[in-house]
């Protein structure tokens, strides 16, 4: 992958993750989840065939639409300690991922760019799923965890 495209893609992914967990609106969170699935499509299209990557994109966007249909009336209330915890988790996981993911390339046969993004999404999803009390946030966290696993698996 071209380095500039990787930097742009990781910036969009980090901003999407931050927007998902710091927004009070479910629709805003779901829009950024759709953007996250679009970034995943661009990553998977480089490794998988275009048809499989498109199926993954359509499946993700349909998941976003279905969740929007059922959870559009849910209102999220963010409190200051939770916002600080989310920001600290994103920063902590980002630092750990950028520090240790390149060493994982000796064990996993994958480029370091895919491994960095996959491990970042996997760890963020796992931490958020473990610390969220809201079922909507837990569901979104599990979808992010599965996205990270798919990128690592690809």
Residue ranges and their predicted role:
Residues 1-154:
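Alpha-helical transmembrane segments of multi-pass membrane proteins predominantly involved
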């Amino acid at each position: 992958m071209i380095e500039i495209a990787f930097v742009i893609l990781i910036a969009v992914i980090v901003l999407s993750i931050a927007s998902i967990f710091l927004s009070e609106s479910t629709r805003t969170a779901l829009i950024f989840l759709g953007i996250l699935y679009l970034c995943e499509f661009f990553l998977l299209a480089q490794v998988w065939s275009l048809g499989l990557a498109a199926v993954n994109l359509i499946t993700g966007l349909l998941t976003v639409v279905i969740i929007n249909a059922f959870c559009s009336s849910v209102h999220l209330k963010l409190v200051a300690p939770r916002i600080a915890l989310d920001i600290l988790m994103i920063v902590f996981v980002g630092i750990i991922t950028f520090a240790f993911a390149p060493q994982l390339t000796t064990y996993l046969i994958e480029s370091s760019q895919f491994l960095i993004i996959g491990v970042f999404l996997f760890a963020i999803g796992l931490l958020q799923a473990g610390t969220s009390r809201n079922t909507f946030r837990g569901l979104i966290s599990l979808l992010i965890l599965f996205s990270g696993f798919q990128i690592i698996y690809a």
